[in-house]
Amino acid sequence: QHEDYTAAPMCICSAMSQGYIGYDLQNNIREELLNRGIFRTVSTVLTSVVVDPYDEAFYTPTKVLGRYLNAEEANLERKKGNYIVEEPGKGFRRIVSAPNPVSIVEIDAIKALLDADQVVIACGGGGIPVLEQDNHLKGASAVIEKDLTAGKMAEETDADMLIILTSVEKVKIHMGRADEKDLGEITVDQAKKY
C-alpha cells in the first residue's frame, strides 16, 4: 500500500466489482450455453439500486468489509471518518451501512432484455447504492445485501422462482444460538416468518 493511496468511494467500488464479476459470469455462462448447443445472448446490466437516505442502517453501520487492519491502520481510517470494528485476535475492519433496496433504476432495461429471451446478469453485489435527489442519482457510501436486492428484482420482474446461490451448504436461522436450524426449501409464508 502506498502512502499517497486514495480509496475509491464505495459506490465506485461496487460498480467496478459488478463490472468485472459480471463480465466473468457473462463469458462463462455464454461459453457453457454454446457448449450445450444453446445460442442465447447473455447480457450484464450495470445496476444502480435506490436506497432511502433515512434508512436506519445509515445511522448504525454493521456490514464488515475489506481486509484486516492493524491498530495503526485502523486509527488512520477512523481519522478519515470511517467506522472501524475490532475482531478479537484478528485485527480491525471497516464497517459500512447496509440499507434496504427501495427500487432498481435499470428495471425497465432488465425487463426488456428478459422479454427478448436473453440471459440477464443484474444487481451484482446487491447493486450500486444510490440516493435520489430531485430526479438525479448520487452514489451512497454503503453496500446493499445481495439477497434483499435479489428479492426486489424477483418482485419487480414478477419472477416465478428465486434461487440464491451460496457457498454455504444450507441457509441458517438463529445462527450461533442453541436453536440454530438449517433451512432447505421453504415457502413464502415461512420466509416471511423469519
PLM regions: where:
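Short, surface-exposed, polar/charged, turn-prone segments marking secondary-structure boundaries
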Residues: 11-14, 70-75, 147-152, 190-194
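Glycine-rich phosphate/nucleotide-binding loop
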Residues: 158-194
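Conserved mixed alpha/beta catalytic, RNA-binding, or beta-rich assembly cores of soluble enzyme
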Residues: 3, 104, 119-166, 174
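Glycine-rich beta-alpha junction loops
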Residues: 46-53, 125-128, 168-170
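Short acidic, glycine/serine/threonine-rich loops at helix termini
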Residues: 53-60, 132-135, 173-178
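Generic secondary-structure boundary/loop-capping signal
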Residues: 7, 93, 102, 111, ...
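Glycine/charged-rich beta-loop-alpha catalytic/anionic-binding loops adjacent to active sites
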Residues: 2-12, 132-140, 187-194
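Ligand-binding beta-strand-loop-alpha-helix segment within the catalytic cores
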Residues: 2-120
